[in-house]
Amino acid sequence: MILRNPLKSPFNSELSIFKALLMSTITESISNDYSRFISILGVCKTTDQFKQLHSQSITRGVAPNPTFQKKLFVFWCSRLGGHVSYAYKLFVKIPEPDVVVWNNMIKGWSKVDCDGEGVRLYLNMLKEGVTPDSHTFPFLLNGLKRDGGALACGKKLHCHVVKFGLGSNLYVQNALVKMYSLCGLMDMARGVFDRRCKEDVFSWNLMISGYNRMKEYEESIELLVEMERNLVSPTSVTLLLVLSACSKVKDKDLCKRVHEYVSECKTEPSLRLENALVNAYAACGEMDIAVRIFRSMKARDVISWTSIVKGYVERGNLKLARTYFDQMPVRDRISWTIMIDGYLRAGCFNESLEIFREMQSAGMIPDEFTMVSVLTACAHLGSLEIGEWIKTYIDKNKIKNDVVVGNALIDMYFKCGCSEKAQKVFHDMDQRDKFTWTAMVVGLANNGQGQEAIKVFFQMQDMSIQPDDITYLGVLSACNHSGMVDQARKFFAKMRSDHRIEPSLVHYGCMVDMLGRAGLVKEAYEILRKMPMNPNSIVWGALLGASRLHNDEPMAELAAKKILELEPDNGAVYALLCNIYAGCKRWKDLREVRRKIVDVAIKKTPGFSLIEVNGFAHEFVAGDKSHLQSEEIYMKLEELAQESTFAAYLPDTSELLFEAGDAYSVANRFVRLSGHPGTKNWKSTVR
C-alpha cells in the first residue's frame, strides 16, 4: 500500500506515519521517485529518522538527485539543526550549490565556533562565483570569536558588505552593530547605526546593550532620549536595558520616567520588568518606592527579594536588610553573598562569618565571590584558623580558585602574620594581575620584610605590570619599616617622573611618618607644609608621634594643636598635650587643657584587642566586662598585679595616653584561661 497523503493516514502517530512511509519505499519497485522521499522528509522529527531516510535514499538510488540532495541538506540544517559535520558530508555531495545552500553551511559552521571555518567556506563560495546575499553576512559576523582576530576579520567583512552593495540592508547593519559592540568598538558601531538603523527598535536595543557592556551607561541613557525624539517606541527589552543603566549611574529621575512609561502602558508589566524597577530604585537609594513596588507585585522571585536586601545593604541599613533576608522563601548564592558582604562592609566581621556558617547549614554551596568576602573578614579579624579552613574548603569543593580568590588568600595570610604561606599562594598561582603583585608588596612591607617587598616591586615591572598608587604606598611603607630613607625619597620622586602618579594624602603621610621616625622631624614638617592638599589629622598625628619620640616639644605642641583644630573632641590628643605641658613644667597651660577636658566632657575612645580561639574571634574593650568570662579574667589580672608588686615592679605611669594595654592584658589573660597560651594571631589597637 502506498500512502500518498500522510495526513489521511490511518496511523495515529507521526512515528507510525514515518515508519509506514519508509516501508513503502522499500516495497515499491520504483526507485527513482525522489518526490516520494521528499514527502517522507516532511514528517521526520528526529535525527535518527532522518538518517534512516537518508540511508534508504542511497539504497534506492535517489540520493544522487541534485534537487533531493539540496532538500535533504536544507532540512537537516534548518529544521533539525543537526550536527555540522554530518551537514558538511551532505553539503559536499551537492553539485553547484546555490547561495541558500552556502548560507546554511556557513550558518552551521558559525554556530559551532569552529575556528574561522565559516569564513573559509565564504571565501570558497566567492571562488565558485556565488554572490553573497543579505543572509550571508549576518551568519558570518555573528559567528566571529570575540578576540583581536575577530575584529580584523569583521572589518574585512564590512568591506565586502559595501562591495556587494548590502550596506543599506537592515539585517546586515544590525549584525555589524552587534559585531563592533561585542569587540568594544562602540564608535564604529555608532557609525553604522547612525547611517540607517534608527527606524528599527532592535537596532536601538543593540546599541544600548553595547554601551551597557562597555559600562558607558550615560550613553545608554542618552540613546533612550534620542529614541523618544525619533518617535521610536521602546520595547520591554529597551526598558530593561535602560533600567540596568539607571541602577549603575544612580539616575533616579530617569528611573521615575521609565516607571511612568511602564505605568501608562496598558499591558501588565512582566516579572522581569518589575524586578528591574525594584532593583533600579533600590540602587538609586529610593527604598520607599522600591518597597512599594515590591509589595504590589503579584508574583515575586528570588531576584525581587534580593534586590530589596541589596538596596538596604548598600544604604547601610543591615537591620532591615536582615529582616527581608530572613523572610525570603528561597535564598540563592547571590542573596547569601550580599548579606555576608554587607556585614563585611559595615565592619561586622564576626557577623559576616556567622552568616557564612548559616549558609553552609542551609546546604548552599558558595562561589568564588562568597569566598573572597569570607577571606576578607578573616583577614580583618586575624582569624588564621578559620582562614586555613576556608582554603581547605575551597580546594575540597572545587570552587573556582581564580586570581581574585588567590589575592584574597594572600591578603589574609599576610594580615594573619603568615608571610611564608602568602608567598606560597603567590608562587602557586597560574595567573597574577596587578592586584596580586600589589598585595605582595604591601603584605611584605607590613610584615617588616622591606627588602623583599622592594624586590617584588622590581620583579613586577620586569613582568611589564605597571604599579599604581597602592603599590607605591606599599613600597614607601617597606622603606618606612626598614628605615631606608634615601630609597624612599627616590621612590617618592619616581611616582611622578616614571609613572605619572600624583602622590596622595596617604603617600605624603607615609613620608612624614618615615622621616619623623628617622629623626628628621624638620624635614618631615617641610614635606607636610608643602603638601598640595590640606593635611588631615592622621598626617599631623604622624608628626606628633615623631616629635614626642625625639623630644621635640615645640613641634609636638604644634602638631597636637593642629589635630585639635580638625578633631576638637579627640581625647587622646588632649591627654598627650597634658603630658607635653607637664614635661615642660608649663603648669598654667596644663591646667587650661584639663579645664577644657572637664568643661566639654571629652572622653578618649577606649582601645580594644581581638583574639582568635577555637575558630572564634573574641573582642575585648578597655574597661568593658561584658565577656562571659570577665570575672575570671579580672581575677587573674588582680593576681598578676599582686605578684608584680611582691616582685618589686614599679610601673611607669608618666605616659597615660593609651588604654589599649588594659584591653591587651584582658585578652592575654583570656588566652591563658582558655588553655591556648601559644596563640599568636591577635592584635591590640585603639579606635
From Swiss-Prot:
PROSITE patterns: PPR. Residues 615-645 are annotated as: Type E(+) motif. Pfam families: E_motif, Eplus_motif, PPR, PPR_1, PPR_2. Keywords: Repeat. Disulfide bonds: none annotated. InterPro entries: E_motif (IPR046848), Eplus_motif (IPR046849), Pentatricopeptide_rpt (IPR002885), PPR_At4g14850-like_plant (IPR046960), TPR-like_helical_dom_sf (IPR011990). Residues 539-614 are annotated as: Type E motif. GO terms for molecular function: RNA binding. GO terms for biological process: RNA modification. PPR repeats lie at residues 98-132, 133-168, 169-199, 200-234, 235-269, 270-304, 305-331, 332-366, 367-401, 402-432, 433-467, 468-498, 504-534. It comes from the Eukaryota. NCBIfam families: PPR. Belongs to the PPR family. PCMP-E subfamily. This is Putative pentatricopeptide repeat-containing protein At3g15930. The gene is PCMP-E51.
